[in-house]
Amino acid sequence: MNQELTNNPFNPLTPPKVFDEIKVSLASPERILSWSYGEIKKPETINYRTFKPERDGLFCARIFGPIKDYECLCGKYKRMKYRGVVCEKCGVEVTLQKVRRERMGHIELAAPVAHIWFLKSLPSRIGLMLDMTLRDLERILYFENYVVTEPGLTDLTYGQLMTEEEFMDAQDQYGMDAFTANIGAEAIREMLSQIDLEAEAEQLRADLAEATGELKPKKIIKRLKVVESFLESGNRPEWMVLTVIPVIPPELRPLVPLDGGRFATSDLNDLYRRVINRNNRLKRLIELRAPDIIVRNEKRMLQESVDALFDNGRRGRVITGANKRPLKSLSDMLKGKQGRFRQNLLGKRVDFSGRSVIVTGPELKLHQCGLPKKMALELFKPFIYSRLEAKGLSSTVKQAKKLVEKERPEVWDILDEVIREHPVLLNRAPTLHRLGIQAFEPILIEGKAIQLHPLVCSAFNADFDGDQMAVHVPLSLEAQLEARVLMMSTNNVLSPANGAPIIVPSQDMILGLYYLTLEREGMVGEGKIFGSIDEVQHALDAGEVHLHTKITARIAQIDDEGNEVLKRVETTPGRVRLGALLPMNNKAPFELVNRLLRKKEVQQVIDTVYRYCGQKESVIFCDQIMTMGFREAFKAGISFGKDDMVIPDDKWGIVDETRDQVKDFEQQYMDGLITQGEKYNKVVDAWSKCNDRVTEAMMSTISADKRDENGAVMEPNSVYMMAHSGARGSVTQMKQLGGMRGLMAKPNGDIIETPIISNFKEGLTVLEYFNSTHGARKGLSDTALKTANSGYLTRRLVDVAQDCIVREHDCGTDRGVTAEAAVNDGEVVASLAERVLGRVAADDILRPGTEEVLVAAGQLIDERMADAIHEAGVQTSRVRSPLTCESEEGVCAMCYGRDLARGTMVNQGEAVGIIAAQSIGEPGTQLTMRTFHIGGVAQGGQQSFQEANQDGTITFENPQLLLNASGESLVMGRNMKLLIKDAQGEERASFKLGYGSKLFVKDGAQIKRGDKLFEWDPYTLPIIAEKAGTAKYVDLVSGIAVRDETDEATGMTQKIVIDWRAAPKGSDLKPEIILVDSDGEPVRNDAGNPVHYPMSVDAILSIEDGQVIEAGDVIARIPREGAKTKDITGGLPRVAELFEARRPKDHAIIAEIDGYVRFGRDYKNKRRISIEPSNEAMEPVEYMVPKGKHIPVQEGDFVQKGDYIMDGNPAPHDILSILGVEALANYMVKEVQEVYRLQGVKINDKHIEVIVRQMLQKWEISDSGDTTLLKGEHVDKQEFDAANEKTIARGGRPASGEPILLGITKASLQTRSFISAASFQETTRVLTEASVQGKKDKLVGLKENVIVGRLIPAGTGGATQQMRHIATQRDNVVIAARREEAEAAAALAAPIMDADIVDDDFDTLVDTPESRD
């Protein structure tokens, strides 16, 4: 089943070593000696005159093997016949030179040395074993302090540190032999070897049972974990201190002579030389009985040199070479992008590949690419040689080579034969998703550029401005088969991210199809009637009708029974021509193209054709509409000049009007009616509205029908056609050319108040030009930075999801998630039908109000079912989801549902995790590259009211209203909702009403679309009086809690609450406003509590002390953040923040239980809020809220589990622990989708769910019960269940725990496979941990298998793996049967014969997993 590790050079027929898992553990000195072929005693490398390796040196041939194949060093024994002989003169074994890559040596150290990984890699393993701090350990190891290892009868303690003087004093005081204290690694080694692991573990468990407090149990648990891992893995603690150092084979640290007598060498040789030099010097000093201080210094230097060899720069100064460059240590060889893992094991270079510039190949078929002859000749050389020999045109390879070099005509004929039906792979970097590599059939072309089919450009994200692509040749038959069946461009019509076609015409083709399907009144031949498509074509050619004429034609259609019928349709000749290309199918009627086709519609047409007419038809159709699109665009001759950019006549009127408005605002500000911030917001708003109006005026001017002298409608404006069709450009760009450029943003995202009124046609003034440079430059720098960020996000996503593979058909779970339409701001952004499409139903989906089953449980919901669900008006339904899948490894096909790129149920072995990661990561890069297209134009404009988006009846949920003095109803509740219901009483839209909103409708009112429902102040959050009374300031001390701010510009004063905690006397103030009645008694609310309003920092007070107020008056206003520009800048980091599960800075506090709010006492800068549960049995829950933060709940309010006590973004961990997995998934999907939707990118929810599933793999143990699990430990769900099953079987108490959410980086580092984690990040830390625990890697994910050089267990690799598995099982059965037969026969033949011998004979016949134990 599995491939080799190394082959024996003498016996190539020995079976390769087969392995199922890889284990890493500490190497004992004995183990190191068993690997070694001899000790290296000298630091010499090679003799600079003879270039022969020095004996006993770092390249010694006696230890590591000969330098030339089958030849000893002195030349006495040469050639094969002596192989295996050891030469008596030079001591070299005669064998292959290759053994110099595998034989290791060793260095015997004169003094033990601590391994820096186990010392410095936090948490320090040696420190945990000895219960000492890292600083103390370093003092001992680097010879600063002594440590007591055996106190004897003195009053010293074990493990006590002493300085040299203290040590001397103690010796004088207690005598030399009364105690032992030691220094250096010897002391540490001695202490480690004295540890009895079992006793230590017992002791720690006992301590843990007694320990109280916060820190103590944590520390004990940490130590216990390390002790347990040593016990389980069979490692000994003293092996963390080395007495022998292994030396890696010389070929892996080569020394190469350069010309001019110099040598290039690997840094490792320098590091080893240092170690050997110091070690030899130390040996000599010990023999000479040198003074203690000298020996000690030498030992310290030895320790430092070994540290540098293992991990240079981890401790102390970096050891540098001759050129002041740090030397690359063993750790550096593994780490980072250039390290062994990422450079050589995960990223390999490929032979049989070439690259060249791409040009467009519009005459190619979709499955073809043009390959330059020169390139093909070079790439297919081996195939050509073999054909030449087979045909007898050459007898040797050399001859064939000559023929090919001369490029004889027969060579080209043979190349044609070879290439036919042999697909090649094309790849464009960066390969962001799997469509970045596709297979094509090569067509030989002249020239030197690769021709690419225009329709696949969007999949490769390629354009023809000098992009290059690489060509790879699949060599083996299997590779060719996979290229043809799985990777052919014709098999990749749909995008795996959202299931929409990705083979879609763009740019010119769209323009051509748009022009083709235009319809204009009054064109020549209007109203004519034609009998067939051919007649229409004839009339067109004769010039009797125009492409855009309105005509009637008879068109052949397929009806529902499948018969061909002729239908009369009103259409245009252009559309008739397009309709002629449609495949005949009743699901693809002529109506599909009988409309103006823009980009979206074209995509829809292709989608429909693909879904209902099959792949072959749709590929042919795509090719045909591509050709037609290009041809029509060329015939239409659309181009534009400067006069096509029309400046609307009323532009200046609108601008002047806005200028007056802005003057008004300035005046109001001067009079002190509004604050600086409000003025700014209003001005920005006014200008963005002005901008929109100018844009509308421009668009209506451009898109208006113009007629010529004959009354025929003229062709639309060219620029308008390009933007409207979706070919190129957008309204934003057009408005900058012909309207006004609009508001600009500063680099920090603030909007500049003065807009750019000119457009590019008029030209900008110098000041306007200067203002616009900010945004443009920011756009460019953003692009450069974000590409890297996006790539890193993709890498983390791939890493966390790489082992998520479809492993089985059905896991049999009955769980699922509830799907409903995605609503954003009262607008349905994704209907229920869209969201359940391609999922498996978890329960029967019924038609509302009846028992009719639309979809049975366990059925895959396809387009037809989804339409039925939509028409029936189903509101919610339960579907299976990868989140709730109960497969042991990976997910099951039923929970995943449809494979988006194929449109059918997902296959087993599909790597859905990687597809999810690519689907989420790929648009990240796309979006970041797109920020600067609008050139930093701000898209401001705050919405301050809500209009009804449909007719219906109003109902309120949780209403809390208050009528103010002028009779307006104000919303006083925090979680009030307004619903619009249709005639059937089904909810059609819902809006959250913010506190302080003004309502314009009554409960139960009938409304029309476009009615104003409610409005709010977008810039400030009001605090509203709920009762009438006299306002009284409490603790609002001027200068400490309130500052009178006088505006220079207006001379008006207003009171603003400032941070009172900063003031010396302010820490115990509680600034608030209370209401008193005429007697001075506090006014009480309905619950009987006094009415008081705590003030938060930056609030603006709207009333004076002692002012009489009515219910509904505004007491204070809290400013909201101003309008920042939104682009994906907010987006990418937001996505990363969500997937990393970071806690947002000011995160919301979520109520954990239902209950009543009580305010506790205040502290210096926090206030305590507790929730008294409505259920008496539960404990109250307390929260600390920073003072000065706005708290939306009042004393005595009833809150439900999941309500916010403090505003902000919720932390995903809280959602998980309080509301559960499904709520978390909904939150993540909603938030991630929001970011992508803003950019118009569609991603299927499934992908996000797969990633969230990977983030939820671990459980945190909250109570260990009688299991071996420790409290606070993070374990996999499977481990958790297994441990509990074991304990329950023994009759013990099971452990309890809850799922925890890990960010993607953490989750990748905590995967069960240490190989995969090590190749991701923090390589040394991962490997240190793995080796202490003696971890086994079962090689289940993709990454581990790539690293050990196997086929991945997904796709075809997974299938072959299963076949091999089944085969070995069958073999085992047969072998067992044979063994029994043989034993029976032997027992009959010779009853005295020992059974063991028979066993052994049979073991060697077949190598099976069983016989490998």
From Swiss-Prot:
DNA-dependent RNA polymerase catalyzes the transcription of DNA into RNA using the four ribonucleoside triphosphates as substrates. This is DNA-directed RNA polymerase subunit beta'. The keyword Zinc applies. It comes from the Bacteria. It catalyses: RNA(n) + a ribonucleoside 5'-triphosphate = RNA(n+1) + diphosphate. Binds 1 Mg(2+) ion per subunit. The RNAP catalytic core consists of 2 alpha, 1 beta, 1 beta' and 1 omega subunit. When a sigma factor is associated with the core the holoenzyme is formed, which can initiate transcription. GO terms for cellular component: DNA-directed RNA polymerase complex. One of its GO terms (biological process) is DNA-templated transcription. Its EC number is 2.7.7.6. It comes from Ruegeria pomeroyi (strain ATCC 700808 / DSM 15171 / DSS-3) (Silicibacter pomeroyi). Zn(2+) 2 binds at residues 811, 885, 892, 895.
